[in-house]
Curated annotation (Swiss-Prot):
BP term (GO), one: negative regulation of transcription by RNA polymerase II
SUPFAM superfamilies membership: WW domain (SSF51045)
Protein's name according to its UniProt entry: Transcriptional coactivator YAP1
Organism of derivation: Canis lupus familiaris (Dog)
Subunit structure: Binds to the SH3 domain of the YES kinase. Binds to WBP1 and WBP2. Binds, in vitro, through the WW1 domain, to neural isoforms of ENAH that contain the PPSY motif. The phosphorylated form interacts with YWHAB. Interacts (via WW domains) with LATS1 (via PPxY motif 2). Interacts with LATS2. Interacts with TEAD1, TEAD2 and TEAD3. Interacts wih TEAD4. Interacts with TP73. Interacts with RUNX1. Interacts with HCK. Interacts (via WW domains) with PTPN14 (via PPxY motif 2); this interaction leads to the cytoplasmic sequestration of YAP1 and inhibits its transcriptional coactivator activity.
Domain WW residue range list: 170-204, 230-263
Amino acid sequence: MDPGPPPPAAPPQAQGPPSAPPPPGQAPPSAPGPPAPPGSQAAPQAPPAGHQIVHVRGDSETDLEALFNAVMNPKTANVPQTVPMRLRKLPDSFFKPPEPKAHSRQASTDAGTAGALTPQHVRAHSSPASLQLGAVSPGTLTPTGVSSGPAAAPSAQHLRQSSFEIPDDVPLPAGWEMAKTSSGQRYFLNHIDQTTTWQDPRKAMLSQMSVTAPTSPPVQQSMMTSASGPLPDGWEQAMTQDGEIYYINHKNKTTSWLDPRLDPRFAMNQRISQSAPVKQPPPLAPQSPPGVLGGGGSSQQQQMRLQQLQMEKERLRLKQQELLRQVRPQAMRNISPSTANSPKCQELALRSQLPTLEQDGGTPNPVPSPGMSQELRTMTTSGSDPFLNSGTYHSRDESTDSGLSMSSYSVPRTPDDFLNSVDEMDTGDTINQSTLPSQQNRFPDYLEAIPGTNVDLGTLEGDGMNIEGEELMPSLQEALSSDILNDMESVLAATKLDKESFLTWL
């Protein structure tokens, strides 16, 4: 169905005279244009459905270059004109700097603009130890500090005068005045320099007095005591016409206003001449520790200390030799006469003598004298190194990190009863201790001094160590005797019955 032709458009409205003028203060009407459609109330015309408004701007690269040029070359850049400061809506105080106020109490307030009056907390002025007790006698000592009278404040408020302040009744220096701010803090006015400060000028005075006061009496006393003695040799005291005293040195043909008795060089020479001559100590041995023999003692004391150290060293050397003699015969118990002269036994004996020869300077150990003191014999029967168990400095403590069990000490894996039974099982000929050869069948003795080595080297170096390879094979094929089996059963039975045993059998 054809809707028909559209209705004719309304004729354009003729322009007539403007309406009544707008009231004052209202913006003038804009340029004449087509009237807004009815009901739109001059709202911006929305784009049709499905259309978007695209704002086309210039090249962004050129805009960035312009910004960089404005910064790098401010003279050649086209800086946009800004609104002058006079045309901006700024208060009048912006263009009028504050006038400097007179020096008065009203000018020193916390609300002022003076930046030089910031509180300064100096560490040296805040320590109560630097304050003399006599200066704060009028005040009272409180837990928060020194305060008195109106300066006292509640403990909850930490004011400046509660740290380290001088009471108000102590007079100020000339030209100074103390005032308080609205918050109660004290400051000081210097009328001489026309300045204000937070620092109390009385603190500097007290610190100067405390530094100069104690030093002056000793100096005067030392000068009086030193000047009261006789003049050095070659010096003479004389007096001028005005009554001034001067000193003549006849040795150098010179005069001086300074008393030679006050010169520390002459005083030192005088003391040295009056004191008794001291002998120079002999040169110390290289092995002597410098910390023990040094220290400014007399030569006699140093010689006594040196002799004591030498005696101690000799005594320790004798202990070690006695220990070696006590332990070495035990290694010869299980050596048969047939194997004592074997090359292997001689080699072990030579190796055991090497450390001893090095310690004694290449000479073998001498035979112990029968008149050796009982003290050395009792101290050398312990069976360990004297440097490890002597005194409380170093001792072989009980081990708490043993891997065998949870006990506080460790024991060897081989029980002692079994070792004793092995000694009884020796079927060889009985060896007389007096007829033993001089060869030693031991490892070097310094292995026994190592802590934690509880292995009996003498047992390991018995007949089994000296048997050659050809003799070892037939011995393994022999049947075990009944005596060995009986001994093993007795040892195992004793171990099972012993509840306190900490052996771990793997």
